Design a protein with these regions (language model features):
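Alpha-helical interface subdomain recognition
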Residues: 1-201, 212, 224, 240, ...
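Alpha-helix capping at helix-to-loop junctions
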Residues: 201-205, 222-230, 239, 243
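N-terminal glycine-rich flavin-associated loop
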Residues: 207-228, 254
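Short, hydrophobic/aromatic alpha-helical segments in well-folded domains
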Residues: 216, 220, 232-233, 294, ...
Length: 519
């Protein structure tokens, strides 16, 4: 039997759906309304996921997070319902929202999670073994060097990459028949999600993102590559013999992938690349870069794009240049960043650079289909980015909880102050909802669905990571603003999550918004 809060949630859910149908479908003129609704839908979906997976010990947290979500929905939709084509509805049992939000209930939740673990995510036994393996690896190998890599802007050391190769980390999305760990007959996105979370808990830049590029390239090859290409590349990527990067973004084509202009002109035996790219992460160390280029200049949209596997020597330098005997040239220069350090993101330039025709993904069949192959990889990449956000905020939360327990202020432990307890309750809710929703989406995608949810969970988890990292730093006070504590790294790393793999605004309006307003 449903309680009043659940009944109230159903009515708000119906209101949200109605608002999505009512709002205009003009992705330019109506983008403010679309953005608000997309973010609301993302949070509401996460709140439902947490409510569905919370056992008896964590019901208070689930109710608090759901009530907070409904209170926010009420503010967004009903302050002026005419904006979304709604009348002024009467919500049954609306007072049910108030009880979980009372200060005494919030501090009770904060006290619970100040001394107890976050809700269990209920993994199958084989997945729990994998999670524990990578959690131990993160504690032993990644966390001890993560802050040094960040503070000194170092490249990920081989002492991390080599054991990750041995664990099969780079082959999580590659079928066993090609040398990877993914079963040949089914998807296993749960493994990818939990491994990503554990590595990201150690370091987002130096570990959690190492498997994103193999994930995107593997999906593109499996979707559109020829059998010869799959046999040539997938095994080497899975073993870590071939390190890889992905090069899509340009100065005037960030999240607007369809506007890519780097050209690939047909020549005897292959193609000539001319143009530049930005934000090509790990381009220096990589042996191959997946490059999205325009092969048909008569098509100004996504229809004229193709994908190429561009081979190069590995380099550990912040700047590199590779010249071909034919006169072609590739250069790369690392971009200095606030955070997300360890893999280095490069500005790339290609001048008359020759790529053999066998490196066009899909061969002749793949010509001008690169956009579709890229999007296939990005969809899984967005799920993985949600997992990266989960790992980062969990790490920020755990270090902050320990700090608050030890720190005293005004003759009381920091953790005993009600405002601290409220922040702990908020962080626990955001992290737990992000984790359960990420796993729910992974299961949907394993069954062939979940495309919209992959975008929603990316929106929610990445925004949550910013909020958690901000509160974590705030609770550290002045020490949080110093370089030494890891929470300062969490703070600057969290910001990038809502930018890459599709900016928050573009994803909410152009991807989620298009789906919401059509359906």
């Amino acid at each position: 039997m449903k309680n009043d809060l659940e009944t109230c949630a159903e009515e708000y859910s119906a209101l949200l759906d109605q608002a999505c149908m009512n709002v205009g479908a003009d992705l330019f003129e109506d983008q403010i309304e679309i953005f608000v609704l997309a973010m609301a839908k993302a949070r509401f979906s996460a709140a439902k996921s947490l409510a569905n997976h919370s056992g008896a010990d964590h019901q208070d947290l689930a109710k608090y997070f759901l009530a907070s979500t409904l209170r926010e929905l009420d503010r967004l939709l009903l302050a002026d319902p005419t904006v979304y084509g709604l009348s002024q509805p009467e919500i049954s049992g609306k007072e049910a929202i108030n009880e979980p939000l009372k200060p005494e209930n919030v501090t009770k939740i904060g006290k619970q999670y100040a001394s107890a673990p976050l809700p269990d995510i209920h993994l199958a036994s084989e997945h729990e073994i994998i999670r524990k393996t990578f959690s131990d690896f993160s504690d032993k190998h990644i966390k001890p060097v993560a802050q040094k890599i960040h503070n000194e802007n170092l490249l990920v050391p081989k002492s991390l990459i080599e054991p990750l190769k041995d664990l099969g980390t780079f082959g999580l999305s590659i079928p066993e028949k090609f040398g990877g760990l993914k079963p040949d007959d089914r998807e296993d996105l749960i493994t990818m999600v939990i491994v990503t979370e554990e590595l990201s808990a150690g370091s987002l830049g130096a570990a959690g993102s190492l498997i994103t590029r193999p994930e995107i390239i593997a999906r593109a090859l499996l979707e559109g590559g020829t059998e010869q290409q799959k046999n040539k590349w997938l095994g080497k990527i899975a073993s870590g013999e071939t390190l890889c990067a992905v090069s899509v973004t340009e100065a005037n084509a960030g999240s607007d992938v369809a506007s890519v202009s780097l050209s690939a002109s047909k020549t005897e035996g292959g193609y000539i690349l001319n143009g530049s790219k930005l934000w090509c992460t790990f381009a220096g160390a990589a042996n191959v870069i997946l490059v999205l280029a325009r092969t048909d200049k008569t098509e100004k949209s996504h229809k004229g794009l193709s994908l190429f596997m561009v081979e190069k020597p590995s380099s550990e330098s912040d700047e590199f240049e590779f010249s071909q005997d034919s006169g072609g040239r590739m250069t790369g220069k690392a971009i200095k960043t606030l955070g997300y350090r360890g893999m280095h993101s490069f500005e790339m330039s290609y001048t008359d650079f020759f790529v053999p025709e066998e490196n066009l993904i899909g061969g002749d069949t793949g010509l001008n289909r690169g956009f579709y192959y890229t999007m296939k990889g990005f969809l899984n990449g967005r799920l993985q980015t949600a997992a990266r956000a989960c790992g980062l905020m969990r790490s920020a939360y755990e270090s902050t909880r320990a700090f608050a327990t030890d720190r005293s202020i005004f003759n009381k432990k920091l953790v005993d102050h009600p405002l601290t307890l409220r922040k702990i309750a908020d962080m626990a809710g955001l992290i737990s909802a992000s984790r359960t929703y990420t796993l729910d989406v992974a299961k949907k995608m394993e069954q062939g669905g979940g495309a919209l949810d992959a975008n929603l969970v990316k929106l929610f988890a990445c925004q949550s990571a910013e909020r958690v990292a901000r509160d974590a730093l705030q609770l550290h006070g002045g020490m949080g603003y110093a370089q030494e504590p890891e929470v300062s790294r969490h703070f600057v790393d969290a910001k990038v999550l809502s930018i890459f793999e599709g900016t928050e605004e573009t994803l909410a309006v152009r991807v989620v918004g298009r789906e919401m307003t059509v359906n």
